[in-house]
């Protein structure tokens, strides 16, 4: 075969895969971390016989053409039976490697990631270098980058209902040039220039808000349109337009977005499959060709690894297994990732999945944003070390931002970029950074991590403590001065010189920059998405089974309501009942499609992330989500039609039966496509619920059943022709009424038309057989249209927008001053309102030494209290999974008799590895456990602990900071203080106290900031932590528990939080913190340590001592324990030397050693002493359980709910807006029909307007209130546990706040619709109409709340509540009037709230009209005979409607009081 033909065949083998991302292959697939070459050498030097045999196999392999050779490898045959021995060698096709073979290969190459990865990568590099192949590299240059965002300043940025409306109008006026733009620009990056070199690890540091994420996004070519950006970023001298940056570089976000129902392995495999292999295949073919020419035989295992990693289209790739191993995810590879609803992996593991998702691809440059959040320092160290090996050996480019890098992790980096207030303060080699700051007059203290020092040295508050030129007075050095000084520093000069010389493009490797948009062919991407969608459908099978069952239940109800023995064919009225049954069937099939909304929306954040990373185009995602649902439609619709068709007594012809089934299939598919499109266009659950209900409403009302075609106004007739429901209703009606059952001619009929034709004409349906096929064809057209629109929406729309950023005026001034280099005076300086604390910047140990608790005397006095606990045991029922593994005990013990004491003015750290029981112990002591078995004694200052009184004197700062999202910081504190301080504290003292607390925790500049939802809007993680502490402090507690107060924070933020904690202790309070991996200075801010080991036992309880001397002395005194190195973090050392593996190595039990120590005896004596009440003391006593009276609790809860509702435009503004729109639509659709009473159809039309409004606006209220109540409920659990209020005042606040909003909604709707439809203008009739509408909207809202109260989450609530909407719809009296309902179902009409509403509305409007209709019957008599609605019953109806409202509200309150879905 000639070379050209051979290369042609090789290219075809790649199946359309990824153009020129050559370095991608070579670097990032390796850039994970395994690396073993320890065993691979052994395998190539076996016995002579084996060598000969292997040589023959290699010779045979060499003779193959390149096309076949790159697919085959020589591998050992693993013996069966798990012995692990080798039974000779064989040639295998790398595309068909099984999981066991892949595992065995990896095990030989990289047995232990920490030890073997580097050796493995060096082997790879050696093989590539041996034949002289260059690995592509990328140098990223950025020059004069400027970025700024438009923000609203002050209160105009708060998302109130009023602001949202005025801001929208203002935005429109700005766009038209009528009004000037009131937004101000906030600088994010300012004149940022630099170079990121290949084969070097760059660490990006900077305090929060310094612009790190923006810089990383700019370098990766991923900045959004909402940020104004200038400057240029080049890769190897090429502008961004010359290649595809999203595939050349990988940006790893700080947000973990994954599909919870997929396992870790499936998530990474899908990512690898979409990203393709880049240039690995090109490199491999060239490598193979050169080795053959040079007669070089590669190492068999390395050869197999490279070949298996270079093949596209594999469902599971060897690279995935390799990355899993390096990231330490192999232990949870087959565990679900999990989310709010599905239990899954831990937060730290989820963070690693986010990293792994990009590492499995072939990108050449990595930009990684805060990849260490939630990871302990040893895991972070291991991951960064593996990345470093890959970058150094295989020529990658990496910029990584980390929050609190430990000193050993910091030392792994080559270069540092320090960013502050959007300016580069330093960029260059790690070794030169301290020299630069010493020139500026600042020195890093000995026991301080350099990374922590760098984050703090530019900050206004922290700078002073590092000033070393004591002969000169200190003055604040602004960021601008640092930035300009760096320009004249030797490192800054050399970077400027290098930037002045353009990059030599001739050095650019052709494979370095990727020019193809996607990694593999479109068909391959479609296959990958089909496989994933099928997998998710299997995992979500419960939803589909539930949906099918729900349809069958509705079908069973429908067929017993429209029972064939009660269904006659004697008059046109009977035809109307049959048509009602058909309408109900169509409607239920339509409603069934609604469940596509949440299924679509929950997957969208992950979809948008993957689309923007160019994993796949939108159509490869939308087609599988449509096609794979078709078989489900067959089952769901089949169950419905097969059950009900003959029982209801539709036309018995088999042909008509199957035609109805076919039509129902089309309706089901059309509905699913419609709601997928609505979900894709709305991208937010609340908006989608409103928009989806709105679309359904328009299609229903204009579908020809609620309002007949002849009565549709000429200005709305277009709506009739484009409503899918019209085609469905017409087709299904024609199919039924043109059948043999309906072809009789009535004796009293004036025409020769059959009964079926007359029935069709009475409802405005075209009585021609062709309308079945017209309807069916139209539905197919709508299916295509909605699926097409869904695809377009997902192709072009951005993810749902976060709320408009808003900043305080002080914050903006400070930001601008820092960039301009101005020094702010103290009065306007946002961050320095609390000068007492600014001066308090000595190191923590100095604070501890100088502290005088009385000096910071808070406004309010409190009683210092101690807490002791003796022999505390805690156990839970043994989980079923553990019993399944053969464990016979009934209980699992989590705490095994721990004892200790916490004292006033002493700060205690509660530490231990994951699973040691830190949070469990804290929950037990604080009384926060909702289940399990507790034994042992707990005393408070010598008296037995009673939870009711203890809750009043203690505070608990939870790890996940739960607060009401729509209130400001100061309002959160005011609410907490109002409910928790004694009632004798007057409002002025309370305000002073809140001010003092805000100063203590440095929240004054944020007083008017909205709290927001974590990760979505509002406060940053660190600010939320401080708010959590402040919310507990304003209760003036004596004892405070804090769970992980510094997790997820950068070094500076952690220092601020610890300063807050220290200040709190110095006021004489008792404070206990669980803490994860603290830095030296955070660890040494504590006075005492309570150290636990896995299994819930204590191994050290005692003082830390100066520079942790007591702790070090204790552990070094244990025989065999290695001594601590100079400068090493005592916290890290202590955790390392006390692990279970260390215990086994030394043959000791640290718990036993502690219990035999003198320290233990001292602690026992202290517990004994503190467990005895001091003379003259008395037990804690409060006359009432809560500090406020019941009435005041109700007022406080109502005040907070008022703020929450006023600032929730997605709920309230949209609700009022859509009510107005629906009112105007109904007014124009049913224009002037209210006064017409000539025909029965006129009454049906008027009733149709009432029925539609009640059902649709009611369901809209019910569905949209659920997420709001659900968010507030999680806050309620925390606040109730803190003893702030009882359940009833909370329920009262949540219920009462709905009244004004629902009243406004009812008045808007009532006035518009009543006047436009033309009902009779009498005061009584109008107020009855308003009365019934108001209470109906209200009971629907309370029904939605009740559903949330009774279920664990609002997803479950929406499924449960939607089951009842269909039944209420059927028994409302519109589809089938009450007298026609079979006797066995008539009882339900009396307990159906919608039936009572329609009773009230129809009876109040028409029940007293004596005007005769066309056939001579007075309207009043027709209403009484046909509907059984009596005007004289209006008073009873009103009472029943109010009773339903009260019942649902009461059930919500009862559920909140009695049910607790929080498991602790």
Swiss-Prot record:
List the membrane topology term(s).
Multi-pass membrane protein
Cell compartments where the protein resides: Membrane
Pfam families referenced in this protein's UniProt entry, alphabetically: ABC2_membrane (PF01061), ABC2_membrane_7 (PF19055), ABC_tran (PF00005), ABC_trans_N (PF14510), PDR_assoc (PF08370)
* Residues that bind ATP 1: 206-213
GO CC annotations, alphabetized: membrane
Q: Which InterPro entries match?
A: AAA+_ATPase, ABC2_TM, ABC_trans_N, ABC_transporter-like_ATP-bd, ABCG_dom, ABCG_PDR_1, ABCG_PDR_2, P-loop_NTPase
Q: What positions does the domain ABC transmembrane type-2 occupy? A: 524-737, 1192-1406
Q: What are the GO MF terms of this UniProt record?
A: ABC-type transporter activity; ATP binding; ATP hydrolysis activity
UniProt keyword list: ATP-binding, Membrane, Nucleotide-binding, Repeat, Transmembrane, Transmembrane helix, Transport
ABC transporter domain mapped to chain residues: 173-446, 867-1119
Please give the chief subcellular localization of this protein.
membrane
Outline the segment boundaries, as ranges, of region: Disordered: 1-26
- The record lists ATP 2 as bound by 912-919
Can you tell which superkingdom this protein's organism belongs to?
Answer: Eukaryota
What the record says about family reads: Belongs to the ABC transporter superfamily. ABCG family. PDR (TC 3.A.1.205) subfamily.
Question: What this chain does, per the record?
Answer: May be a general defense protein.
Q: What is this protein called?
A: ABC transporter G family member 35
Q: Which organism is it from?
A: Oryza sativa subsp. japonica
Q: Which gene encodes it?
A: ABCG35
